[in-house]
């Protein structure tokens, strides 16, 4: 069976993401995500999307959507932002922790984008990002340049097709070198609460101990 992947266009709908002049992150991410997906589909991957139009879903909804779909990988595409305009430029990728195939995929994507002309700012661990900590599968969040950097926006606009190819090839190169999808291992339920706050407190304790924990809501319980 082919690998399956869920692509997430960051933000959307009432959430524009970062905004610079007339430019909105949600528009750049949707256009780029669809272009990346088209390339991956042409290479035989089973591609699913959190959104294909300008609609809003919370990060939690996106993570649960990926989990329910049972995909092998999750890649979220964003544009970065900095408090001062034109102060920083470059690409970086975020992962839950710097280990496993997700780290390799993040590094491959960054290197492909660096070849186009972006500054490679590396891979950073962000264990508190919802789409990284609540997805069951290896997940990467890619920041494709700073939206308030004229240098990065010029690269984005003038090399759009190459950027889509770079992200797609970074993913494909990773999969080609890893014929086996990382085993999800065994999952253990450690609690069931009617009060979401109690479940959230336990979640934070588990995450602090480096367990890849997440909350499942159903039957009026938080597990």
Question: What residue ranges belong to the model's regions?
Answer:
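Periplasmic OmpA-like peptidoglycan-binding domain that tethers envelope proteins to the cell wall
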Residues: 19-26, 196
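Short glycine-rich His-centered loop
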Residues: 3-22
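Short, polar loop/linker segments at the starts of domains and inter-domain junctions
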Residues: 20, 154-155, 201-206
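Active-site-proximal helix/loop segments of hydrolytic enzymes
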Residues: 2-4, 23, 27-183
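A short acidic, helix-capping loop that chelates divalent metal ions and anchors anionic groups
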Residues: 15-18, 150-152, 223
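Short, flexible active-site loop motifs that bind/organize anionic cofactors or intermediates
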Residues: 19, 52, 188-189
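A mature extracytoplasmic/lumenal domain signature
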Residues: 11, 51, 81, 146, ...
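Acidic/polar low-complexity segments and flexible, solvent-exposed patches
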Residues: 122-125, 160, 173, 179-223
């Amino acid at each position: 069976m082919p690998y399956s992947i869920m692509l997430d266009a960051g933000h959307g709908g009432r959430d524009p993401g970062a905004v610079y002049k007339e430019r909105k992150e949600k528009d750049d991410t949707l256009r780029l995500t669809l272009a990346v997906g088209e390339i991956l589909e042409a290479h035989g991957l089973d591609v699913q999307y959190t959104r294909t139009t300008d609609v809003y879903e919370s990060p939690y909804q996106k993570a649960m959507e990926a989990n329910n779909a049972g995909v092998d990988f999750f890649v979220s595409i964003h544009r970065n932002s900095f408090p001062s305009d034109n102060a920083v430029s470059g690409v970086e990728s975020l992962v839950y922790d710097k280990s496993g195939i997700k780290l390799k995929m993040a590094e491959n994507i960054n290197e492909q984008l660096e070849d186009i002309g972006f500054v490679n700012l590396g891979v950073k661990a962000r264990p508190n990002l919802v789409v990284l900590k609540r997805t069951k599968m290896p997940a990467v969040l890619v920041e494709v340049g700073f939206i308030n950097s004229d240098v990065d926006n010029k690269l984005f606009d003038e090399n759009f097709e190459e950027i889509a190819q770079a992200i797609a090839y970074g993913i494909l190169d990773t999969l080609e070198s890893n014929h086996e999808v990382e085993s999800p291992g065994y999952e253990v339920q450690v609690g069931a609460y009617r009060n979401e706050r109690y479940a959230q407190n336990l979640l934070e304790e588990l995450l602090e101990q480096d367990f890849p924990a997440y909350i499942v809501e159903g039957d009026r319980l938080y597990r």
